[in-house]
């Protein structure tokens, strides 16, 4: 129970709170781009996952050395995208803090997920896993809600509707499907392929930001960084 309480907070609370704070300072597509670092951190936390061999013994997965070059390509893409965005800004301190918050969440999410995978019962479904983690983290969410009410009062109806849509699409549908896919992965390549699907988040974020939020098209340098990042993630997933 203690492990469930601790790692549920790490996976959910320490993931959503930093990202929610970063939204006030960075455009959505840049948050999605920086968030792709979670794929690198996910690979680095792979040894925390243990799989059951045919002989019944549990063995920790290993970090494949073949993934390191593509991880560097992903990192280069993220750095180029972020640097191109910050280049024309005069006050970059809040932006750097927001990027740091995203990186913190990018570590917390795969770390919490890996540690929960180590203690979850094989018979537990992805939906049951998400529900259990939500219940374990709920006291902290109530505390955060209480502090927010004390400082700014009740949210507007528009905020409630937007939060409901995000919670349903990202917090329920996407999380359950993602956790189900990670449970089906039996080796590092399959696990990396599952996590690589998150790269499409960048493409959708750019397109939807242009369509609905009126954001400017990323600069050529930023587009190059995004291309390197998505390409590195895809190659990481399909490597031999």
Where would I find each of the regions flagged by the language model?
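Hydrophobic/small/kink-forming positions within alpha-helical transmembrane segments
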Residues: 9, 13, 17, 39-44, ...
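Hydrophobic alpha-helical transmembrane segments in multi-pass integral membrane proteins
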Residues: 14-23, 76-90, 137-152, 202-218
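Juxtamembrane helix-entry segments on the extracytoplasmic side of multipass membrane proteins
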Residues: 1, 83-108, 150-165, 218-227
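C-terminal transmembrane-helix exit sites in multi-pass transporters
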Residues: 39-67, 185, 190, 201-223
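Specific transmembrane alpha-helical segments of multi-pass solute transporters/efflux pumps
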Residues: 1-35, 80, 169-188
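Hydrophobic transmembrane alpha-helices of multi-pass small-molecule transport proteins
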Residues: 43-47, 62-85, 220-240
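Helix-helix packing/entry segments at the starts of transmembrane helices
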Residues: 30-37, 119-137, 171-211, 239
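Hydrophobic alpha-helical transmembrane segments of multi-pass integral membrane proteins
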Residues: 67-77, 97-101, 116, 120-172, ...
């Amino acid at each position: 129970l203690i492990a469930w309480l601790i790692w549920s907070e790490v996976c959910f609370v320490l993931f959503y709170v930093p990202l929610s704070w970063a939204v006030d300072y960075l455009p959505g597509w840049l948050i999605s781009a920086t968030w792709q670092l979670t794929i690198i951190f996910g690979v680095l936390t792979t040894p925390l996952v243990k799989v059951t061999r045919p002989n019944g013994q549990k063995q920790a997965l290993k970090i494949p050395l073949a993934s390191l070059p593509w991880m560097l390509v992903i990192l280069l893409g993220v750095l180029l995208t972020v640097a191109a965005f910050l280049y024309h800004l005069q006050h970059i301190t809040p932006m750097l803090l927001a990027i740091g918050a995203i990186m913190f969440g990018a570590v917390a999410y795969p770390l919490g997920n890996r540690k929960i995978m180590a203690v979850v019962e094989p018979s537990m479904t992805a939906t049951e896993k998400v529900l259990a983690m939500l219940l374990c983290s709920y006291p902290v969410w109530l505390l955060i809600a209480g502090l927010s009410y004390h400082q700014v009062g009740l949210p507007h109806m528009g905020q409630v509707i937007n939060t409901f849509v995000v919670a349903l699409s990202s917090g329920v549908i996407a999380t359950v499907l993602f956790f189900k896919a990670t449970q089906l992965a039996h080796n590092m390549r399959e696990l990396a392929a599952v996590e690589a699907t998150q790269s499409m988040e960048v493409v959708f974020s750019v397109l939807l930001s242009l369509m609905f939020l009126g954001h400017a098209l990323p600069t050529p340098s930023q587009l190059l960084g995004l291309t390197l990042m998505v390409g590195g993630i895809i190659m990481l997933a399909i490597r031999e």
